[in-house]
């Protein structure tokens, strides 16, 4: 897949996709090749092995985490709430939503009151550097879900099982 095709597929500019290719090259991740004069990405058949190779160098897409008093009822689900949509895991009593850096101001998240330690949580909103709507249903993509989860969330056995189920069904087994 060429840089321009990759950019279209994930909904970013060609320049952003080119920077991603540059980072892959810099990190010495063996997925880039040349087709004529164009750089191309060649995803190996064993996606799970590739993920295990690159997960340690990928950045968490979460820029900031807002823990709010009121449920903002935002359409995009992220983090643990998105994981629940992909698996049989039950969600927290409060949902986790996503807004991109661009959407943050218009969403009103910054003016909402954050909870103190003793208050009940209405929702969690993750400000993300990017949001890939994986199934066109407003759910964060599975790989970004894994990167977005806190260490505490990932340590829970039920969450770990759900992560593995999600990756197996939506990522490793996909054509």
PLM features: residue spans?
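Residues within the helices of the helix-turn-helix
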Residues: 3-8
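Residue-level detection of the helix-turn-helix DNA-binding "recognition helix"
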Residues: 22-26
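Short, Lys/Arg-rich nucleic-acid/phosphate-binding segment
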Residues: 32-50
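Long, low-complexity, charge-rich intrinsically disordered regions
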Residues: 52-175
